[in-house]
């Protein structure tokens, strides 16, 4: 079973440097990230749901809650669109299990569908994502609202004796979570602080007034507010991707892909789950690290409210994210493991978190492997024209593919996310090892170094390992 680890942000006194506090990365929670999806059912949500279901193996899906928003004030629970997608998922589930045994059975997902707040009057007239920003006036009072099955389910999940964070993805409005937090505070005062501290909301804009209410009255909850999904993943941002959609989804053969309702990539809500995929970027551990779902900074005046830094922090990952999505779409139609591509595996026996002193040599190394056979077909499509110019044939390539087709390639680079603002000089020692000399610092600083390993098959898939090096003064 895949394991996902969460960073517990604590401080301790380092034994190697008395009286110097350094981040402790030794305490970890084992298990997959717990996620709740709240969706208002509009077109982008339906496309994002197709994408999401193919990553259900990477997460523990605790609830899918149908809600409303300022764009879909009545919600869409009356339309069985989720049930229809799950029926299609059920058709491809046997093949998906071949490629990863952790894919949840369809009935497991059906059991966690709930209806949340779809009351139009709970969304104030005239509000806009352009004005409902961190610090906006509170316009709603969830104490006046009725409970819903969705809000009650959120309460149940947060009260469970499980220390893992609960990532609440707000594809639409936040009101269902706002009601849950209000009930939690009033009816479970002794459990409230422990429970609310586990809540992490990823909001695709504030699409109602619930986010502002949570900021003020439930500051123990963490909010990640994304605006830069617009211009990267949303409607119209990738209008030149129609070939991708027609070839891999709307091709008349894909049971789930046919529910992708747009003619091009149109998934404004997809960033809400991309950072919870177990790809090695560790974006789930801290919103400032960054990953496929963007990178965030803390908003001034708030302890737990963050906004995404830029469009570029999302756009730089679109290509590997879509290649990975393409591979999983192909898993749906491929009953034999060896006939599809899978991401390389990276193992770091010595651990990803290192503490050193200024001036010390830091060596980072990993073990990279790819279980898939060499992709002769893909290699010939990519480079066959060059080999043919030298008199080679495809049969020549098939004779000894391991000698002519690389198993994988890798890159190393310094990444944003660390506190050290200078640059380091990485010295490469092959595909799986680099070193550098720890720079001079006056106080403990962190440097993030990323290993990116990608295979040479089609579609190319990428895995990562993020090393976090804490540098202490001499």
Short names for language-model regions:
Residues 2-7:
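Sec-dependent signal peptide recognition
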Residues 13-16:
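C-terminal motif of bacterial Sec signal peptides marking the signal peptidase cleavage site
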Residues 19-427, 433-435, 441-450, 466-472:
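N-terminal acidic, glycine/proline-rich low-complexity segments
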Residues 454-460:
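Short, solvent-exposed loop/turn segments at the edges of extracellular beta-sandwich modules
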Residues 463:
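Charged, cofactor-coupling segments
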């Amino acid at each position: 079973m895949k394991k996902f680890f969460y960073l517990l942000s604590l401080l301790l006194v380092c034994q190697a440097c008395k009286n110097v506090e350094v981040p402790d990365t030794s305490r970890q929670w084992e298990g997959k990230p717990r996620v709740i999806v709240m969706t208002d059912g509009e077109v982008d949500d339906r496309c994002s749901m197709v994408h999401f279901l193919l990553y259900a193996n990477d997460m523990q899906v605790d609830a899918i809650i149908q809600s409303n928003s300022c764009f879909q004030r009545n919600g869409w629970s009356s339309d069985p669109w989720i049930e229809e997608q799950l029926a299609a998922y059920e058709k491809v589930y046997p093949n998906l299990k071949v490629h990863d045994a952790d894919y949840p059975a369809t009935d497991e997902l059906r059991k966690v569908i709930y209806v949340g707040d779809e009351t139009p009057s709970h969304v104030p007239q005239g509000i806009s994502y352009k004005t409902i920003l961190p610090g906006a006036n509170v316009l709603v009072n969830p104490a006046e609202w009725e409970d819903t099955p969705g809000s009650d389910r959120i309460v149940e999940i947060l009260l469970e004796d499980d220390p893992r964070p609960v990532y609440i993805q707000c594809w639409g409005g936040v009101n269902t979570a706002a009601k849950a937090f209000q009930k939690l505070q009033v009816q479970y005062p002794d459990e409230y602080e422990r429970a609310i501290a586990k809540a992490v909301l990823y909001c695709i804009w504030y699409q109602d007034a619930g986010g502002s209410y949570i900021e003020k009255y439930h500051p123990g909850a963490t909010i990640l507010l994304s605006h830069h999904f617009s211009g990267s993943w949303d409607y119209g941002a990738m209008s030149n991707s129609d070939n991708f959609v027609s070839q891999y989804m709307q091709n008349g053969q894909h049971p789930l892909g046919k529910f992708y309702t747009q003619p091009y990539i149109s998934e404004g809500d997809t960033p809400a789950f991309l950072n919870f995929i177990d790809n090695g970027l560790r974006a789930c551990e801290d919103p400032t690290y960054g990953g496929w779902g963007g990178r965030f900074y803390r908003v001034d005046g708030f302890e737990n409210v963050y906004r995404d830094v830029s469009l570029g922090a999302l756009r730089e990952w679109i290509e590997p994210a879509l290649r990975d999505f393409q591979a999983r779409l192909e898993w749906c139609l491929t009953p034999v493991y060896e006939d599809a591509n899978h991401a390389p595996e990276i193992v770091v026996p010595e651990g990803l978190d290192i503490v050193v002193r200024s001036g010390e040599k830091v060596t980072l190394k990993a073990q990279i492997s790819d279980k898939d056979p060499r992709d002769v077909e893909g290699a010939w499509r990519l480079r066959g024209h060059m080999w043919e110019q030298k008199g080679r044939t495809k049969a020549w390539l098939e004779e000894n593919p391991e000698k002519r087709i690389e198993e994988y390639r890798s890159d190393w680079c310094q990444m944003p996310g660390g506190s050290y603002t200078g640059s380091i000089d990485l010295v490469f020692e092959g595909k799986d090892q680099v070193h550098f000399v720890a720079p001079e610092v006056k106080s403990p600083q962190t440097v993030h170094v990323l290993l990116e390993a990608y295979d040479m098959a089609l579609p190319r898939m990428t895995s990562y390992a993020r090393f976090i090096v804490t540098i202490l003064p001499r």
